């Protein structure tokens, strides 16, 4: 092989390695975003469960009051 071909090959390999490094950095960023979203999802799921429990509690209280009113009438 001529030196020119070797130089072209080296340039292509270097560009490929740089591209791989960029892709690794992008992958790391996406992994971090994914972890943050999973954490946020867990928090929202817990909050949703708490709100569901609160709603059920208030529904029971309202139904109890309606029952008392019906008994009085």
UniProtKB/Swiss-Prot annotation:
<comment type="function">
    <text>Non-essential, abundant cell division factor that is required for proper Z-ring formation. It is recruited early to the divisome by direct interaction with FtsZ, stimulating Z-ring assembly and thereby promoting cell division earlier in the cell cycle. Its recruitment to the Z-ring requires functional FtsA or ZipA.</text>
</comment>
<dbReference type="GO" id="GO:0005737">
    <property type="term" value="C:cytoplasm"/>
</dbReference>
<keyword id="KW-0963">Cytoplasm</keyword>
<comment type="similarity">
    <text>Belongs to the ZapB family.</text>
</comment>
<dbReference type="InterPro" id="IPR009252">
    <property type="entry name" value="Cell_div_ZapB"/>
</dbReference>
<comment type="subunit">
    <text>Homodimer. The ends of the coiled-coil dimer bind to each other, forming polymers. Interacts with FtsZ.</text>
</comment>
<dbReference type="Pfam" id="PF06005">
    <property type="entry name" value="ZapB"/>
</dbReference>
<dbReference type="GO" id="GO:0000917">
    <property type="term" value="P:division septum assembly"/>
</dbReference>
<feature type="coiled-coil region">
    <location>
        <begin position="3"/>
        <end position="66"/>
    </location>
</feature>
<keyword id="KW-0175">Coiled coil</keyword>
<keyword id="KW-0132">Cell division</keyword>
<protein>
    <recommendedName>
        <fullName>Cell division protein ZapB</fullName>
    </recommendedName>
</protein>
<keyword id="KW-0131">Cell cycle</keyword>
<dbReference type="GO" id="GO:0043093">
    <property type="term" value="P:FtsZ-dependent cytokinesis"/>
</dbReference>
<keyword id="KW-0717">Septation</keyword>
């Amino acid at each position: 092989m001529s030196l020119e071909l070797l130089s072209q090959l080296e340039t292509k390999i270097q560009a490929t390695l740089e591209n791989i490094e960029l892709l690794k950095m992008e992958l790391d960023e996406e992994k971090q975003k994914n972890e943050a979203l999973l954490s946020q999802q867990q928090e929202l799921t817990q909050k949703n469960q708490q709100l569901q429990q609160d709603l059920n509690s208030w529904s029971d209280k309202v139904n109890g009051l309606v029952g008392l009113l019906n008994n009085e009438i």
